[in-house]
Regions:
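Extracytoplasmic/secreted cell-surface and envelope-processing proteins
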Residues: 18, 51-52, 138-141, 235
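Ser/Thr-glycine-rich phosphate-binding loops at phosphate-binding pockets of nucleotides
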Residues: 229, 233-234
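Cys-dependent protein tyrosine phosphatase-like superfamily
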Residues: 60-224, 237-333
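Binuclear metal-dependent phosphoesterase catalytic core
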Residues: 2-66
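Histidine-centered active-site/metal-ligand motif
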Residues: 1, 226
Length: 333
């Protein structure tokens, strides 16, 4: 540090070095300057060559040296066009270990990412992006990905008789019909049933198995997974992952409910327009937000069928104890 605000950081690509969680694959050095809005990369040194790219925002957990202890727990990356993009690292387990930052990200869809935000996204050096959406959702809003990321489709709701996301989007265009169809608690009841299906549907079990096996390969990290708004299918995947890592249940819910902090403000115009056209606010927030009762339903389904998260992984997802332990060794330190 020259002035208490500038720091040298290494390997902004993530990695598995146990002594430096979140650092690894160290192929460059960067001068990071602390600004009022957070740390930014200034001149980047690539193999001894100064690359004057200008300021690029980065997360403080990438800094090799920090002037104070910073706890990055399920933090947002602050990418405005992808508001629910968050790092799943930083959570502490019941036995005191911590999930590594920079390896696994949860997100909403990437179809509307801006060019400037794509540059920031590219700095994550993603290897895989897992899309949990239905075919109709993917066709309506095709994926936009960084060049480094391989696109993997995992249609969790393929076996659902009627995939709720497509139906709900149509109803949102007609507030009067939405009131009749989804009022009096019907919207919440529909989501509760969907969350049970995340556990019980054959397609959900198949695709969540593929997801967890995919993120258990260190060579395929960092990785990102998402659905449409990054709260329901993504929410259960994140909750199951954190629970398997032995993160306390209250912290699992804390991470899950954070979607309300990012998605509802991002959809404020949609919500206001729906209500102005005669729609019930409780309906639209039930659709676009998350409720504790939704995740309760998924956990209830999991526990009533399998008893424990370990049994859910072993019996529903066919991921045995050895493979579960491998996941923990990758993500925990």
């Amino acid at each position: 540090s020259r002035n208490g605000r500038d720091y040298i950081t290494m390997g902004l690509t993530g990695g598995l070095a146990p002594e430096s969680p979140g650092l690894g694959n160290m192929d460059h050095l960067a001068l990071v300057t602390m600004t009022e809005t957070g740390p930014v990369i200034g001149n980047v040194l690539m193999n001894g060559i100064t690359d004057k790219r200008g300021a690029v925002p980065v997360m403080e957990d990438f800094l090799l040296y920090r002037p104070r202890q910073i706890t990055q727990t399920g933090h947002s990356l602050g990418i405005r066009s992808v508001p629910n993009l968050r790092d799943l690292g930083g959570y502490k387990t019941s036995d005191g270990r911590i999930i590594r930052n920079g390896l696994l990200y949860r997100s909403n869809q990437l179809s509307e990412i801006s060019e400037a935000d794509m540059q920031v996204m590219s700095s994550l050096r993603l290897k895989n992006a897992y899309d949990l959406r239905t075919l109709a959702e993917r066709e309506a809003r095709p994926e936009e990905l960084p060049e480094t990321a391989q696109y993997v489709v995992l249609d969790v709701l393929a076996d659902a008789e009627q995939a709720n996301p497509a139906m709900l989007e149509k109803l949102m265009q007609n507030p009067e019909e939405a009131n009749a169809t989804l009022g009096d608690g019907k919207a919440e009841a529909g989501f509760i049933e969907s969350y049970r299906q995340f556990v019980s549907l054959p397609s959900a079990q198949r695709e969540f198995r593929n997801f967890f096996l995919g993120i258990s390969n260190p060579e395929e990290l960092p990785a990102l997974f998402h659905c449409t708004t990054g709260k329901d299918r993504t929410g259960w995947a994140a909750a199951a992952f954190l629970t398997l890592m032995d993160v306390p249940r209250e912290k699992v819910y804390e991470d899950y409910l954070k979607s309300n902090d990012y998605i509802l403000p991002a959809y404020k115009k949609v919500i206001d327009g729906f209500v102005a056209a005669g729609g019930e606010e409780n309906i639209v927030t039930a659709i676009l937000g998350v409720r504790k009762e939704y995740l309760d339903a998924a956990f209830d389904e999991m526990e009533s069928r399998y008893g424990t998260i370990e049994n859910y992984f072993a019996q529903a997802l066919d991921i045995d104890a050895k493979e579960q332990q491998q996941l923990k060794e990758i993500y925990l330190y």
